[in-house]
Design a protein with these regions (language model features):
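Non-catalytic accessory segments flanking enzymatic or RNA/DNA-binding domains
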Residues: 1-127
Length: 127
């Protein structure tokens, strides 16, 4: 069985510069990023975070849907025309802290945060 994650990322409209936060489920984050970028040409994605449950192996999709139902009133006003894939998974900018708190309450921990990750530096010259 493939490793599962709940991911969160920042989403920004390339034209209006409007920002929102996206929460979703995936078992292949690299493929999901490519799918989002290819399908939603008017949006940029950044600062990905991956959340993993401490003991759960299955049920990630159910937890993601539970969070979406609970937070429906905070959805960003993005239409299907501008974002064909995943427009119902985007929330108002600044709501990511509440989403992280809900994930933490459900037992998820952040295992990767792109905004704080720094790739290893190789020295320019080695003697």
């Amino acid at each position: 069985m493939a490793e599962q994650f709940i991911y969160m990322c920042n989403v920004r409209n390339k034209h209006t510069k409007e920002s929102s936060v996206k929460l979703g489920y995936t078992s292949n984050i690299l493929q999901r990023i490519k799918q989002l970028e290819k399908s939603n040409i008017h949006y940029e994605y950044s600062d990905f975070r991956l959340f993993k449950h401490e003991s759960k192996i299955i049920g990630y999709l159910f937890d993601e849907q539970r969070i979406h139902v609970r937070n429906r009133k905070y959805l960003a006003g993005i239409s299907r025309d501008s974002m064909p894939v995943g427009y119902t998974e985007c929330y108002e900018w600044g709501y990511q802290y509440d989403l992280v708190n809900q994930l933490t309450y459900l037992g998820y921990t952040c295992v990767y945060d792109e905004s704080t990750y720094k790739p290893p530096q190789t020295p320019m010259f080695q003697w």
